[in-house]
Amino acid sequence: MKITGARVIVTCPDRNFVTLKIETDEGLTGIGDATLNGRELAVASYLTDHVIPCLIGRDAHRIEDIWNYLYRGAYWRRGPVTMSAIAAVDTALWDIKAKAAGLPLYQLLGGRSRDGVMVYGHANGRDIEETTDEVARYIEMGYRAIRAQTGVPGLASTYGVSSDKMYYEPADAALPTENIWSTEKYLDHVPKLFDRLRDRFGFDHHLLHDVHHRLTPIEAGRLGKSLEPYRLFWMEDATPAENQEAFRLIRQHTVTPLAVGEVFNTIWDAKDLIQNQLIDYIRATVVHAGGISHLRRIADLAALYQVRTGCHGATDLSPVCMGAALHFDIWVPNFGVQEYMRHTEATDAVFPHAYSFASGYMTPGDVPGHGVEIDEKLAAKYPYKPCSLPVNRLEDGTLWHW
């Protein structure tokens, strides 16, 4: 089965998405997500100018060979743009292969390892009580795992907190907005949130928290220690992961489980953290870590060290990514949890999908392929809109991690 054509579709139904569609001489098509928040056009250009010309005429079934051709042949390996482009090709080819077999994608990976995929939602509020009420709402919707973020007194804005509780989108302007950050105020306030949540809801539900790379290792150790009484499912992105030895210092100070990896692109980004057992959950994604083919390698390595998966699944990844991730999740033996932020109605209309949510779990559906398509006519009604992620400054004006 030969690849006869491929094209990039950029659309913005409430936020920007980049989709690669591959066509074959047997009439089968497949799609893959290539969205890189705030850098969408860089990936679109990479695909159009450098990848698609190399795909035409190749055997669509030779997924592994094509993956290595795009990775090894480029010489300039790794990086979010390259790996997001490769991921789009990989996901589209797995979609085609599963459609050709007449099977849902997870069957080609090895079949189900579980009946459903536990997902966590995002509860947030301007203050602790508002966040607490949002957690209650997620519990009413059936969620068993909930990420909790709250506004911090004295800060005009805080990561993960939005006026629209269900559809959080931080990329809010053509040029980056500048936010003010205070580590001291944050460290003082966050334990109070989880004290309130456990006091109201007890320990029947999993609670998670995203630090979003904002702490130094010793500050992260302090936060993890202060959160131990509340038995979090995980503390996410406690410190920038470029310095992987930092997680050793955090480990020495707390038993709060650690999760990291949404910005990772290859197994090499995760190898030392996994092999040294410095993390408990690896959050690499289908889109930014080279597709299902490469994510399997990361998960296989993690399984050797009892590290579980917790794939990133925010709304800056399209339903195409979510569909593929759920097929991966329902198969992967060392599954932990899947992030699930609901897309808007406009996005779901552009990307009709087979996956569904019920009682805290999701299933990918059983249609052939990964179960997500794109309505190109509808997508064309939502042109690209320049949007950038914010930046942070400390109260004295120093640029800080966002």
Curated annotation (Swiss-Prot):
InterPro entries: D-mannonate_dehydratase_GalD, DgoD-like, Enolase-like_C_sf, Enolase-like_N, Enolase_C-like, MAND, Mandel_Rmase/mucon_lact_enz_CS, Mandelate_racemase_C. It comes from Rhizorhabdus wittichii (strain DSM 6014 / CCUG 31198 / JCM 15750 / NBRC 105917 / EY 4224 / RW1). Substrate binds at residues 37, 122, 262, 283, 312, 316, 339. Its EC number is 4.2.1.8. SMART domains: MR_MLE (SM00922). Mg(2+) binds at residues 210, 236, 262. The keyword Metal-binding applies. PROSITE patterns: MR_MLE_1 (PS00908). Belongs to the mandelate racemase/muconate lactonizing enzyme family. GalD subfamily. It holds the Pfam family MR_MLE_N. This is D-mannonate dehydratase. One of its GO terms (molecular function) is mannonate dehydratase activity. The keyword Acetylation does not apply.
